[in-house]
Amino acid sequence: MRVETTGVNPVPPLAAMNVAGLIDHILSRYHAIHRQELPDLVALARKVERVHHAVPEAPLGLAEVLERLSAELEAHMRKEEFVLFPAMRQGVKEGILQPLAVLRHDHDDHAETIRLVEERARGFALPEGACGSWQRLYAGARKLCADLREHIRVENEVLFPRFELAAAAPRCICAHG
């Protein structure tokens, strides 16, 4: 088995992880980091907008979009942490298709919000002479967008299909059950 290394702890390929390991990875690699980084990005965006509001390239409206993304993500992650992930850890497949459809819809909404972040940040193109705060804002927002895209991909392409396929599989109605 190929092992990806991300620094100190080697991480096995996600497709090779069991459900509990994959959920733990999502919680630590994505949920915890989104919660840690988003409030700082919102504050930094507010600062850059306030200080540079008269600069034509200023990312006006970025703080508002990041704040909305933070609220959307928090609601989404809570649904996963308190409803979906516990059911998945217990191997529940009955009735799981509807919550998965809702969460996939959330992912589509997040993708649109990522697009708005990139639009407000003008593709993360810094103006000449941009201050350190502006540089940190764009670096952090770019990382957030990349992380969130990967987070969505891991759930949509690796975790969710395991349950969608199992829940949609025809059941044997024979004597052996």
Residue spans of the language-model regions?
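Small-residue-biased structural context
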Residues: M1-G177
